Amino acid sequence: MELKDYYAIMGVKPTDDLKTIKTAYRRLARKYHPDVSKEPDAEARFKEVAEAWEVLSDEQRRAEYDQLWQHRNDPQFNRQFQQGEGQSYNAEDFDDIFSSIFGQHGQQSRQRQATRGHDIEIEVAVFLEETLAEHSRTISYNLPVYNAFGLVEREIPKTLNVKIPAGVGNGQRIRLKGQGTPGENGGPNGDLWLVIHIAPHPLFDIVNQDLEIVVPLAPWEAALGAKVAVPTLKEKILLTIPPGSQAGQRLRIRGKGLVSKKHTGDLYAVIKIVMPPKPDDSATALWQQLADAQSSFDPRKEWGKA
């Protein structure tokens, strides 16, 4: 009976990491899957690849296999294999061989290593108004179930009622321990990670912990000053526009930004001057009077003389 070269079967090197081996396994499993492949030996090759993956995907069994491979030319190793000459074997058989050659440690190899389940990550959309206070949210996701070959066999729909804390930010990750896929051989479950995505708002832009809102003003409101009702995340407030306000000017409204555990941001009102529609004769006359009264004003004086 010959010890199979699992690395050659997978087309990888003994020094390759698990990620590389897993990639090779998935490629070969798809290639030789009996339901897909038309090759005459597809089923046998598929079983051989699955057998190699069963050993190389387990850290402890891979280490034992590597040790067996290093001793494959030892007399004791050869005697053990000659006893089984002509017999078929699978990935489990080398556990017995390892035990007979290396003693008690080989017997312990039957106790498969506990493996932690996979983490799952889902995106949760949150409105700006919802960040002001803790709120409950029902989320649904699919829990993948893996077969013995490490491929997703099916998915189980799952629903949870979770609490989204106040002050969550865009891209923040919330961990729900043990809500991922089940562990193997007594290993712990994976976790569910909620990745917060703050939905775009029609009025507010986020700047770190602060908010910005564009406040449209008529030219005379900017020139003379005004009191304007400005929306915040909770309610409208009356904002005083100082006389002579300029387009792009930012007026600070304290404590009306985003909320966090350590700090509450501010709301900045960014002034935008909006011209009225095409003026009639009376409005044109008024604009002309203003132009005559301010004839010395040059809005482009900073350009200097051409």
UniProtKB/Swiss-Prot annotation:
The GO molecular function terms of this record are:
bent DNA binding; unfolded protein binding
What does it do? Answer: DNA-binding protein that preferentially recognizes a curved DNA sequence. It is probably a functional analog of DnaJ; displays overlapping activities with DnaJ, but functions under different conditions, probably acting as a molecular chaperone in an adaptive response to environmental stresses other than heat shock. Lacks autonomous chaperone activity; binds native substrates and targets them for recognition by DnaK. Its activity is inhibited by the binding of CbpM.
Matching PROSITE patterns, A to Z?
DNAJ_1, DNAJ_2
Q: What is this protein called?
A: Curved DNA-binding protein
Q: Which organism is it from?
A: Citrobacter koseri (strain ATCC BAA-895 / CDC 4225-83 / SGSC4696)
Which lineage do the record's taxonomy fields give for this organism? Bacteria, Pseudomonadati, Pseudomonadota, Gammaproteobacteria, Enterobacterales
Assigned keywords, A-Z: Chaperone, Cytoplasm, DNA-binding
Q: Which domain of life is it from?
A: Bacteria
Span of domain J: 5-69
| Database matches in InterPro entries | DNA-bd_curved-DNA (IPR023859), DnaJ_C (IPR002939), DnaJ_domain (IPR001623), DnaJ_domain_CS (IPR018253), HSP40/DnaJ_pept-bd (IPR008971), J_dom_sf (IPR036869)
Q: Which GO terms describe its biological process?
A: chaperone cofactor-dependent protein refolding; protein refolding
Read off the Pfam families from this record. Answer: DnaJ, DnaJ_C
State its location(s). Cytoplasm, Nucleoid
Its GO CC terms are: cytoplasm; nucleoid
Quick check: keyword Membrane in the entry? no
